[in-house]
Swiss-Prot record:
Protein name: Regulatory protein FanB
Source organism, top-level taxon: Bacteria
Known function: Trans-acting protein involved in the regulation of the biogenesis of K99 fimbriae (FanC).
Record-linked Gene3D superfamilies: 1.10.10.2690
InterPro entries per the UniProt record, alphabetical: Adhesin_operon_reg_prot (IPR004356), Fimbrial_Adhesin_Reg (IPR053721)
Keyword set, alphabetical order: Fimbrium biogenesis, Plasmid, Transcription, Transcription regulation
Gene field: fanB
Length: 99
C-alpha cells in the first residue's frame, strides 16, 4: 500500500513538474526587464559581462552567437547560465503556486 501511494505521488509530482516546465519558461525576448533584474538579484550570477549577455538574450531577444561574439563569452558557458536562470525562475514559479 505504501509503495503504491509513493508511486502515485511521484507520478503526480512528475506531471506537475512537466506542466510547470511547459507552462512557465523564460522565453528569449519576452522577459520583462524588471522581472529579469529580480531574477538576477536572487541568483548567484555577479559577472556584469554575463548579466549583460543574459539580458540581451532574455529581454532583447538577440541570438546566442551574436551575444557570445559581442560579450566575449563561451557559448557553452552562456547555455549554463541560461539554464541556471531558467531553473531559478521555475523554482520561484513552483513556490508561488504552493502558497
Amino acid at each position: 500500500m505504501y509503495i503504491d501511494n509513493y508511486l502515485i505521488m511521484r507520478k503526480i509530482n512528475m506531471e506537475e513538474t512537466i506542466l510547470s516546465l511547459t507552462s512557465y519558461q523564460l522565453r528569449p525576448g519576452k522577459v520583462d526587464k524588471k522581472q529579469f533584474v529580480l531574477l538576477i538579484d536572487v541568483s548567484s550570477i555577479r559577472s556584469y559581462k554575463v548579466i549583460n549577455a543574459l539580458e540581451d538574450y532574455f529581454v532583447n531577444g538577440k541570438n546566442r552567437k551574436e551575444i557570445c561574439d559581442n560579450h566575449k563569452i563561451n557559448q557553452g558557458y552562456l547555455s549554463l547560465k541560461i539554464r541556471e536562470l531558467q531553473d531559478i525562475s521555475l523554482r520561484i514559479y513552483n513556490i508561488s503556486h504552493c502558497i
